[in-house]
């Protein structure tokens, strides 16, 4: 089976995948307070936090993962993918959020999840300043990105986490690692990354 789990906290994106051999993949892990100004600033009404405002969205994600992680994962996530550096995908930052005692990064969203359920490999779009937008130099995005880098540095030293940049067209980034020979036809391909899109021809992109 290939399992797709959508973890709905009403505070941003989070998807959890279990590949046929038990390899795990987490895409995004948003986090925000129940009444967050940054998310409200997009002009859309916020849905009520799920299951309630009494628990952080990252804690909801962590609890869900602990329940569904397959035994073969040994309590870790094989691959995490951070699609981009916006708060509704990686977690927003506010002054009242706690700081990780050892790593010095703010605990929220993907940094909260990754500090409590180790990631073996993290894929992202690469540097915030590669093909930048106006958000790369203003607002909360640079602060979120620098906080993410602090987390990556700590997790690399503590858990051996590898940070990699996703490549459009690549079919060898997310691979089954437990018993791939049992599910040979199955594969995962990166279709787009950082402005590049797979052109449908082997591993090339444009």
Where are these regions (language model features)?
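Flexible, acidic/histidine-containing loops and adjacent segments that form or flank the divalent-metal
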Residues: 1-3, 64-67, 72-79, 90-206
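Conserved beta-strand hairpin/beta-sheet module of binuclear metal-dependent hydrolase folds
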Residues: 1-79, 206
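Solvent-exposed loop/turn segments at secondary-structure junctions
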Residues: 10-13, 31-34, 85-89, 128-131, ...
């Amino acid at each position: 089976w290939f399992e797709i789990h959508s973890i709905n906290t009403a505070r941003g994106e989070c998807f959890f995948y279990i590949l046929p051999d038990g390899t795990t993949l987490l895409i995004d892990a948003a986090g925000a307070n129940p009444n967050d100004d940054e998310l409200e600033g997009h002009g859309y009404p916020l849905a009520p936090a799920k299951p309630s405002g009494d628990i952080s969205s990252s804690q909801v994600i962590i609890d869900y993962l602990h329940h569904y992680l397959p035994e073969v994962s040994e309590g870790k996530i094989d691959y995490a993918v951070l699609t981009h550096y916006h708060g509704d995908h990686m977690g927003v930052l506010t002054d009242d959020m706690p700081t990780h005692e050892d790593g010095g990064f703010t605990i929220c969203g993907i940094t909260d999840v990754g500090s409590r359920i180790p990631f073996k490999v993290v894929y992202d779009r690469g540097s915030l300043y590669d093909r930048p937008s106006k958000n790369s130099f203003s607002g909360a995005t640079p602060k979120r990105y620098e906080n993410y880098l602090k987390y990556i540095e700590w997790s690399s030293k503590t858990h051996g986490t590898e940070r990699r940049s996703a490549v459009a067209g690549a079919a060898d980034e997310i691979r089954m690692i437990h018993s791939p020979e049992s599910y040979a036809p199955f594969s995962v391909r990166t279709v787009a990354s950082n402005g590049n899109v797979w052109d449908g021809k082997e591993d090339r992109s444009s």
